[in-house]
Regions:
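SH3/SH3-like beta-barrel superfamily modules
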Residues: 129-135, 321-353
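Surface-exposed, glycine-biased beta-strand/turn segments
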Residues: 127-215, 246, 255, 266, ...
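Zn2+-dependent peptidoglycan hydrolase active-site motif and core
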Residues: 199-237
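Acidic, Ser/Thr/Pro-rich low-complexity intrinsically disordered segments
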Residues: 4-9, 25-26, 66-119
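Non-catalytic extracellular/lumenal accessory regions of secreted precursors
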Residues: 1-73, 151-177, 305
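A short macromolecule-binding patch
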Residues: 225-232, 346-357
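Short aromatic-glycine-enriched beta-strand elements
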Residues: 212-218, 264-266, 336-340
Length: 366
């Protein structure tokens, strides 16, 4: 027993198959040999956790590291119930030297990325409203560039194959019956007879023809612990108790029930234990971002021009954080035409390339 304890403290890596340390813990174990490096590494993580930038639903960035500026940055993501979050970076699988993690709003680590082929990838599926922070940090000795992507995806398939977001013409919460009730679903329009598919694997819990929904199907989905409601169908092609797979055709679009005076469409709803929830995030199709273009890069820049403002997102319409006129900036990376920058007082954001002048690390800023 004593030998085992001593071995753990002297050679903890021998017990990794039991303890299963995170990539960060393994790297910090190596850095204990050089305390000043360990202190720098930990301070960079804290710097990233203080970042306040918020990504869009489909975000990409070209990131680089330099000798004088190891990479560390934090990216907030607002996640709706029904969405999952993906974060990936391209890596050299021979010796990965990046840390990619997800933290909750209290700063608790909830997931560390795993190596997948030539990438480091996170996939977070919690099926609830939340705000997450993705942290990307390079090893101190890393001198490289990579493509970072952070994007959201719906948990379910779109219930009408061949159709997309623009086929949804009526959304959650719209007033019905003169305001006496609200719309508890999405109306997705298509020609009569268009296939309706199972949005997830599950079991058909009911097949009915009655009331406002007319011909309807209920599907019990274990993935999201919910019931899917398909209404106004022209035909039902499944039976109660039947098991179906994601993408199986279960019915055909129609206008039965109280939709008999409207154009044919599918009313798609989702019900959880507390009642109906907005189905839009569960099916809303979000494009996977393309790689961000690489812009000219130096470790430092200076803001210039009266329109030199830092924004929360890489968009002129996003929240303006502050002016950066004549401020010296650390250049972290770029999201297409926007530099990801950090000010001397550690505020991170985005500045358009037109208001950033790149400078040599030892040159004057004026």
């Amino acid at each position: 027993m004593v030998i085992a304890v001593l071995t753990y403290f002297l050679k903890p890596e021998y017990f990794d198959f039991i303890v299963k340390p995170s990539a960060r813990q393994v790297y910090e174990r190596e850095l204990k040999k050089t305390p000043q490096d360990l202190e720098q590494w930990k301070s960079l993580k804290q710097l990233a956790l203080k970042d306040s930038i918020t990504t869009s639903e489909s975000y990409s960035e070209f990131v680089q590291t330099r000798i004088e500026s190891p990479f560390a940055a934090g990216y907030w993501v607002n996640v709706a119930q029904g969405e999952s979050v993906f974060a990936t970076i391209a890596i050299d699988t021979i010796k990965p030297s990046w840390i990619l993690e997800a933290y909750d709003i209290q700063g608790k680590l909830i997931q560390t990325a795993r190596v997948t082929d030539s990438s480091l990838a996170l996939q977070i599926i919690n099926d609830k409203h939340q705000r997450l922070q993705i942290v990307l940090q390079s090893f101190l000795e890393k001198r490289d560039s990579t493509q970072l992507k952070i994007y959201k995806q719906p948990l379910l398939d779109f219930p009408l194959p061949g159709k997309s977001n623009n086929a949804i013409k009526s959304f959650w919460g719209v007033a019905r019956d003169g305001g006496r009730r609200s719309h508890e679903g999405n109306d997705i329009f298509a020609d009569r007879g268009h296939p309706v598919v199972a949005a997830a694997d599950g079991r058909i819990s009911a097949v009915r023809d009655r009331g406002l929904g007319g011909k309807q199907i209920w599907l019990q989905d274990a993935l999201t612990s919910s019931s899917h409601y398909y209404a106004h169908l022209d035909s039902q092609l499944v039976t109660t108790g039947q098991r179906v797979s994601r993408g199986d055709t279960i019915g055909l679009v129609g206008n039965t029930g109280n939709a008999r005076t409207t154009a044919s469409h599918l009313h798609f709803g989702i019900y959880k234990s507390g009642g109906a929830v907005d189905p839009k995030p569960y099916i809303w199709q979000i494009p996977i971002p393309e790689n961000s273009t690489e812009m000219p890069f130096k470790s430092r820049g200076v803001g210039f021009g009266l329109s030199a403002f830092m924004h929360q997102q890489p968009s002129a319409s996003s929240v303006s954080l502050r002016t950066i006129y004549e401020d010296t900036l650390q250049i972290i990376g770029n999201s297409n035409d926007w530099y990801h920058v950090r000010t001397a007082d550690s505020l991170a954001g985005f500045a358009h390339k037109s208001v950033v002048r790149l400078i040599e690390i030892n040159s004057s800023t004026h």
